[in-house]
Amino acid sequence: HNFARYSFDGGKTYTLIGESSNLTAEHLADVWRKLAQEFKDYNNIWGYDIMNEPYSMHPSAPWVNIAQVVIDAIREVDTETPIIVCGDSFSSARFWVEYSDNLRTLVDPSDNLIFQAHLYFDKDYSGQYLNSYDADGITANTGVERAKYFVEWLKRYNKRGLLGEYGVPDDDPRWLEPLENLLIYLRDNGVPGTYWSAGPRWGDYKLAVQPSDNYTVDRSQMSVLEKYTVTAGNESG
């Protein structure tokens, strides 16, 4: 989750990949070559997600070029594991065509790429949910309308995709209808998704689905998510 950036000073400043000779596409590719060499024979590795949410890349090093260098490096040592490529501009599903259309030119000799988009329902698409449901003008189809840009792109170019992040707050039950409509749309179009977020570290974070009261009380989002949950080996469910 470093957005195509790296800090050399403990987080005080961040350098973009491709911004200088200190941090190039080849450096990232070298990391992935080594990771693929190490983990290629692990049957529990579903795919290599090469970078989370790149955005505002340096003009001399667009994300599509960096991704191609990484793909080439991985395929030097692993020809089988799927490679997951996030879109540009924070992987936005809504703005996929504007910022990530060029990813369709990526070449994988193994023909095993999965493109990943992210989607949040708030007005500014950020997932911070700073305003209320009413203030952001949410409708039952907000998620579907945003997902269509990505899903239709996948269909148009015969690509495989994943909605790698989506989530709604637990502070208003009305969020559950657009969430469910999104999941129905993804299911009907054969696009899997992974919810953001889960796990005990999130505390009272309003998008989290970690159960409370010693795992005895589910968060409200689970009433929808459980209807669409599948596990490995049951992807058609």
Annotate each predicted stretch with a short phrase.
Residues 1-10:
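Aromatic-lined carbohydrate-binding surfaces of glycoside hydrolases
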Residues 4-5, 170-171, 202-203:
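Short secondary-structure capping/turn micro-motifs that flank functional sites
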Residues 9-19, 130-135:
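Short glycine/proline- and charge-enriched loop/turn segments
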Residues 23-47, 51-191, 207-226:
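Extracellular glycoside hydrolase catalytic/binding regions
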Residues 165-167, 196-200:
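Acidic carboxylate-rich catalytic motifs and surrounding loops in phosphoryl-/glycosyl-chemistry enzymes
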Residues 194-195, 205:
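Extended hydrophobic/aromatic segments used for targeting, binding, or gating
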Residues 227-232:
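Cytosolic regulatory and coupling regions of membrane transport/channel systems
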Residues 235-237:
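Surface beta-strand/loop "capping" patches
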